[in-house]
Amino acid sequence: MKQRSFLSILCFILLAFGVASVSAQTCIENRKYFTPNGTYDSNRRLILSSLPNNTASQDGFYYGSIGEEQDRVYALGMCIPRSTPSDCFNCIKGAAGWLIQDCVNQTDAYYWALDPTLCLVRYSNISFSGSAAFWEIEPQYLVLNTATIASDLTDFKNIWEDLTSRTITAASAARSTPSSSDNHYRVDFANLTKFQNIYALMQCTPDISSDECNNCLQRGVLEYQSCCGNNTGGYVMRPICFFRWQLFTFSKAFHNITLATPPKPPMNVPRPPSVGHGANTTDNDSRGVSAGIVVVITVPAVVIVLILVVLGFFICWRRKSLQRTEFESDSDVSTTNSLQYEFKTIEAATNKFSKSNKLGEGRFGEVYKGKFSNGTEVAVKRLSKVSGQDTKKFRNEAVLVSKIQHRNLARLLGFCLQGDGKFLIYEFVLNKSLDYFLFDPEKQGELDWTRRYKIIGGIAQGILHLHQDPQLTIIYRDFKASNILLDADMNPKISDFGMATVFGMEESRGNTNWIAETFVYMSPEYAVHGKFSMKSDVYSFGILILEIISGKKNSSLYQNDETTTAGNLVTYAWRLWRNGSQLKLLDSSIGRNYQSNEVTRCIHIALLCVQENPEDRPKLSTIVSMLTSNTISVPAPGIPGFFPQSRRELDPLSEGLESG
């Protein structure tokens, strides 16, 4: 402890004499790596080189991808609103160049560049649009000014907290243009003294939700406060959000703000050091700071100080950065403790698991609505003993799953253990599950084609996120309409991870004798042999697409007689497709308000998903591309799995569909 304090003193003295240049570029470690000069590297260089033009010409925000399969590179470019095209172009170009130069083999990296405007460049080997997963917000980096606020400025803390609080609120509020960099952006200022302002800037990527933006910015502000609350400025950066405050304007972001007029600065009072990136510290903005703000460090014995500086230089240099602090997640123990709820808290929230709070019941337990004392609404799942996990495995998997965050996944907030009882606490989703609307003739009309198409795309994004999580791979194995929740805006959220098998990074196949999924959604290899893989989820997703389009259950077709193979939704869709009358599959409650090309493409994709051979089914990344781009060619589907091979000549068009 004494040694750490001594090192801190040495580093502080050294910093008083000058500030090391700190880069805002981050090559994310502990991910996959690529081979330099290979196909992935070529695609990375190609998309990053095109990013300056694409971003500057598209209102300061661009997201795209290039390449195929494992060599595909996703990239994002973003400038703050009202940046000139020239500044935006140069900022993105500089940031992209730094990433190419410094991140020699990391598949995921980002750079918040500060000059000539503020901009973000990021690339990855997985799609990150709309993602606020745990690795998007941890770890993050903090850079600070070394000078501290004068002790006589007693109102500073209140003024600073009020400024950051209202800036978070304004920045996280969604705009009407979600694809523009103007979404989730705010600059503001407050008067500290008659002649001195405080300036704050906050920005999130425009593709995340307001709650996700608010959460990210709140974390940044709290971490800055706990670390460096008395310093005269700094910034916190993450892949999805950025927070900076200073006693001077910066990044040409404050053109429309009336600035306080500083008095003539006294002699020999140094202004605070600039926080730049790389070797470029040029900033033409106003940087005058009154003498009352900066604490001047006086050293009575200059010789002693110089000796300490020389001694401390090497030690501080070995710590890699004099001003950057990486906040990593706590140990596994503390993470577990932060997620574990006391039983009395859960019991009180659910009114002792009263019948009036019960939302539903499935094979693996009952679900209750709960409300904590702070007003937060949650869904509490009380697992039945058939779930079969031992306590240690249950706790470990709960911690892992809680780290997975995406707008199309119902977030696991924590868990509870009480004797033999196990409980999972999820975020509460306002609307009920998809099947509540989809299979009820009186409610089907609330799901027009636009909403259904959006639901299909959202589910695909959610599954892709589960399959491509860099920390673990989850094969869900329980896709069905009742496990898709709908929020207030009818956005889908995949729920109930109690069935999911958690794998290590390299393992993607497994076997089980426990065939627990609803049979009508099962892939042939899973139902017959108990084998599952990512392609098993693809098969189930294909069934779900057909149900969403038709408003019918896969099991809703009837059997003609005891000798005739039972028809189902898959066989019916295939026969309609083969006869060129696929639009007959569409739910009649939709009427004529639909795009026939979208419906046809979704049926086409669904039939590819339900192919008998897993190798013939597309990957989720390919499915997402097919759904989002009409320029991608879609191969012709073959006969689906579980098709009644012996009765191919049976005329299915005479078979009716019953209500689900």
Swiss-Prot record:
One of its GO terms (cellular component) is membrane. It is a single-pass membrane protein. Residues 264-283 are annotated as: Disordered. Its EC number is 2.7.11.-. The active site is at D478 (proton acceptor). Residues 25-128, 137-250 form the Gnk2-homologous domain. Residues 25-294 are extracellular. It is found in: Membrane. One of its GO terms (molecular function) is ATP binding. Its main location: membrane. Glycans are attached at N37, N53, N105, N125, N191, N230, N256, N280, N284. The modification Phosphotyrosine is found at Y426, Y526. The modification Phosphothreonine is found at T518. The modification Phosphoserine is found at S482. It catalyses: L-seryl-[protein] + ATP = O-phospho-L-seryl-[protein] + ADP + H(+); L-threonyl-[protein] + ATP = O-phospho-L-threonyl-[protein] + ADP + H(+). ATP binds at L359, G360, E361, G362, R363, F364, G365, E366, V367, K381. This is Cysteine-rich receptor-like protein kinase 22. It comes from Arabidopsis thaliana (Mouse-ear cress).
